[in-house]
Amino acid sequence: NVACLGIIGNDIWGEKLLSLLRSNGVNIDGIDIIKDHPTTLKQRIYSDGKQVARLDTEKIIDWKINFMLKNIGNYDVCILSDYNKGIIKNANIDANILIVDPKKDDFSLYSNANIITPNMNELQKATSINIKDDQSIVAACTDLIRKNNFDYIVAKKGDKGMTIVGKNNFVKHITAHYVNNPDVTGAGDTVISALSIAYAKTHDIELSAHFANNAAATAVSKPGTATVTIDEINNYIEFNDE
C-alpha cells in the first residue's frame, strides 16, 4: 500500500509517470498536476554501457503540499526524498517513521527524523569534521545525531558499503557486495526504499541495512534505472550474503 506525493506537469512525461505508478498499484492522489509546468526530466547519456552525462529539464516553483500530507499518519513509514529544489521547506512531517534522503547542507531542517541516509558528499557538507575514514564518519554522525535528535544515520559509502550510527554509541559497518561493472543509477533510491520497508516491518536497523545493501547490489547489477523485486533480493541474499 504505497502512495506518492509530489508534482508533475501536464505533459507526456507526467502521463508516463502516472501510467507507470498506476500499473504498479501506487496511490497517486498525492500528485498534483501543474498546468504549464514541465515534468522534471532526467536524460542520461551512455557510452560503452557507462553513463557519461546527464541532462536535466526542470522548473522550480513554489508549491504547497496537498491534502495527502494530512494522511501521512495512516502509513507505516514516510520517505522524504529532498533534491533541494524548494518544494520541501522543512521536514516537520508527523509520520510514524520518517526516513530522509537529504540534499540540504543544514540537517537541522530534518530534526527529529528517525533515519537519514546521506552519502559521503552530503555528510561532509553537513559537518565541520573532516571526513577521511570510518572513525571520522562515526564522529560526524554522532555529532549530527546529538544536535538534531535523529535515531540513526545510515552513511552511504558507495562501493565501501555503509556505516550505521545511532544513539547510545551504536555503530555498525556493513561491507558492500562486489558487483562487476555496476550501474549506480538510482542506487540511493533503492537503498532508502529497501531500508524503509524493512525497518517498518522489523524496527531492526542493522537487519534493515543488510537488506538494503543486498537490494542495492541487485539493482546496480542491472543497466539504467532499475527496480528490484523481493524475490530477486531474497535470491541475492541466499547466494551472496554472509
Language model features with spans:
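Residues that scaffold the ATP/ADP-binding catalytic core of kinase and kinase-like folds
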Residues: 55, 126-127, 165, 219, ...
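Active-site proximal loops enriched in glycine and acidic residues that flank catalytic Cys/His/Asp
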Residues: 6, 82-84, 102-104, 120, ...
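Structured core elements
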Residues: 3-4, 42-44, 54, 79, ...
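Conserved N-terminal subdomain of the carbohydrate kinase-like
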Residues: 1-77, 227-242
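Conserved phosphate/ATP/ADP-binding segment of small-molecule kinases
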Residues: 83-85, 90-171
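Buried hydrophobic positions in well-ordered alpha/beta secondary-structure cores of metabolic enzymes
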Residues: 21, 43, 78-81, 162, ...
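Conserved post-catalytic alpha-helical subdomain immediately downstream of the catalytic base
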Residues: 151, 177-240
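A polyampholytic, Gly/Pro-enriched intrinsically disordered region
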Residues: 48-60, 117-126, 203
